[in-house]
Design a protein with these regions (language model features):
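Short boundary/hinge segments that flank catalytic cores
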Residues: 1-49, 54, 184-208
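P-loop/Walker-type NTP enzyme "switch/lid" segment
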Residues: 2-23, 27, 34, 46-47, ...
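Conserved, well-folded catalytic cores of nucleic-acid-processing
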Residues: 28-32, 66, 100-101, 146, ...
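Residues that mark the start of a beta-strand
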Residues: 39-42, 67-71
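Hydrophobic positions on the alpha1 helix immediately C-terminal to the Walker A/P-loop
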Residues: 55, 59
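Aromatic pocket-lining residues of Rossmann-like dinucleotide-binding sites
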Residues: 63
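Conserved catalytic-core segment of NTP-binding enzymes
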Residues: 128-208
C-alpha cells in the first residue's frame, strides 16, 4: 500500500517521497512480470475525486522515464478527466475510434515523451455496454503490440460496474483510495466485489 499526493508530482518534484512511491509501484509491477505479463492495467477508485487519474498519469510518467512506451486511455466516459489534467482537447477520443468516427492516428496525443494519450471523446449514452464491447477489447489487444504498458482510467467501482468489467480483460488492477474519505465498510464491500469477480488486484494506492 502506497501513500501519494494529488499533483503530477513525478514531473513537478521527481525527487519527492511521493515520486519515489510511484517508482516503488512501478518496480512492484515490473517484478510481477516474471509471473504474468503486466501490459494492460486498469486503475479504479471506490468513489469520485480520490485521485485515480492523477495516479494513472504519474504511473505513466515513471514508466516513460525508463524509456517504456505507454498508452493512457480515458475510459471514465461519464466524467472524463485526463484531458483536463493535461490541458488537452477532448474533441475526439476512444468512443470515436470504436464507433468508427475516427482513426487511432487522428486521435492519439503525446503530451510527454513516451506517453501517448487517448481521451474519452464524444459523449455516448451507453458507457457500460461500450466498455463491455468486443470492439474495445480487440482495440486494446491490438495496441499491446505497440506499447510496453497500457493504462486504463476507469470509473469508480462504488458508482458503476464499468471498472470491474474492464478488469476482466486487464492483466491487473490498482485500487486508489482517499485516506480521509473511505470507511472500512466501503472498502470491505469493494473487496468482496473484487473477490466475486476474481479481479487481480496488484496494488492499493492511498491518496492524501
Amino acid at each position: 500500500m502506497l501513500r501519494v499526493g494529488e499533483e503530477l508530482i513525478t514531473i513537478l518534484d521527481p525527487e519527492s517521497s511521493a515520486s519515489e512511491a510511484y517508482r516503488t509501484l512501478r518496480t512492484n509491477i515490473l517484478m510481477r512480470n516474471f509471473d504474468r505479463d503486466m501490459k494492460v492495467i486498469n486503475i479504479i477508485s471506490t468513489t469520485a475525486q480520490e485521485g485515480k487519474t492523477t495516479c494513472v498519469l504519474n504511473l505513466a510518467m515513471v514508466y516513460a522515464q525508463l524509456q517504456k512506451k505507454v498508452l493512457v486511455i480515458d475510459l471514465d466516459l461519464r466524467m472524463p478527466t485526463i484531458h483536463k489534467k493535461l490541458k488537452l482537447k477532448n474533441k475526439k477520443g476512444i468512443s470515436d475510434i470504436i464507433g468508427h468516427q475516427a482513426e487511432f492516428e487522428e486521435v492519439v496525443l503525446q503530451p510527454y515523451e513516451n506517453v501517448d494519450v487517448i481521451t474519452a471523446g464524444t459523449k455516448i449514452p451507453f458507457a457500460s455496454e461500450f466498455i463491455q464491447s468486443n470492439a474495445l477489447k480487440e482495440f486494446i489487444e491490438e495496441r499491446k503490440k505497440e506499447y510496453d504498458l497500457i493504462l486504463l482510467d476507469c470509473p469508480p467501482v462504488g458508482l458503476v460496474t464499468d471498472g470491474i468489467v474492464a478488469a476482466s480483460y486487464c492483466d491487473g488492477t490498482i485500487l486508489v483510495c482517499a485516506s480521509n474519505r473511505n470507511d472500512r465498510k466501503e472498502l470491505l464491500r469493494v473487496k468482496d466485489q473484487f473477490e466475486q469477480t476474481q479481479v487481480n488486484v496488484i496494488g492499493i494506492v492511498m491518496t492524501m
